Swiss-Prot record:
HAMAP family xref list: AcpS
Protein name (database record): Holo-[acyl-carrier-protein] synthase
Function: Transfers the 4'-phosphopantetheine moiety from coenzyme A to a Ser of acyl-carrier-protein.
Assigned EC number: 2.7.8.7
NCBIfam families: acpS, pantethn_trn
Family: Belongs to the P-Pant transferase superfamily. AcpS family.
Gene3D superfamilies to which the protein is assigned, alphabetical: 4'-phosphopantetheinyl transferase domain
Major site of localization recorded for this protein: cytoplasm
Keyword DNA-binding: no
GO BP terms: fatty acid biosynthetic process; lysine biosynthetic process via aminoadipic acid
Highest taxon, organism lineage: Bacteria
Molecular function GO labels: holo-[acyl-carrier-protein] synthase activity; magnesium ion binding
Pfam family, one: ACPS
UniProt organism field: Bacillus cereus (strain ATCC 14579 / DSM 31 / CCUG 7414 / JCM 2152 / NBRC 15305 / NCIMB 9373 / NCTC 2599 / NRRL B-3711)
Length: 119
């Protein structure tokens, strides 16, 4: 049963500006594993990566119904890719999580659908 849906869209140029202080911003929103991947990227690919993770985490927090804040932080959520490149969202909550991330020249968008484990 679907228990939550969240979506977020972010302007890439907004993330690009925040990446000027690269490490501080990335430490605030990316887990250590995500930062390790990000440090290997440059230019527009880095911006897309960080924006996609930012949007995915915001979308998840909206699907849960809390937003980013006291109950859910950026560092409580990790986005990895499976062997085919599909993004997978990792959290400590007990939901089935469906995640989609997309980019254009100007935006990154992510959508999360949460299902309960019991059917």
């Amino acid at each position: 049963m679907i228990i939550g849906i969240g979506i977020d869209i972010i302007e890439l140029n907004r993330i690009e500006k925040m990446l000027d202080g690269k490490l501080k911003f990335m430490e605030r929103i990316l887990t250590e594993n995500e930062r390790n991947v990000a440090m290997e990227l440059k230019g527009s690919r880095l911006t897309e990566f960080v924006a996609g993770r930012f949007a995915a985490k915001e979308a998840y927090s909206k699907a849960v119904g809390t937003g980013i804040g006291k109950e859910v932080s950026f560092l409580d959520i990790e986005v990895k890719n499976d062997e085919r490149g599909k993004p997978i969202l990792i959290t400590s909550t007990e939901y089935i999580v469906h995640l989609s991330i997309s980019h254009s020249k100007e935006f990154a968008v992510a959508q999360v659908v949460l299902e309960s484990l019991s059917r």
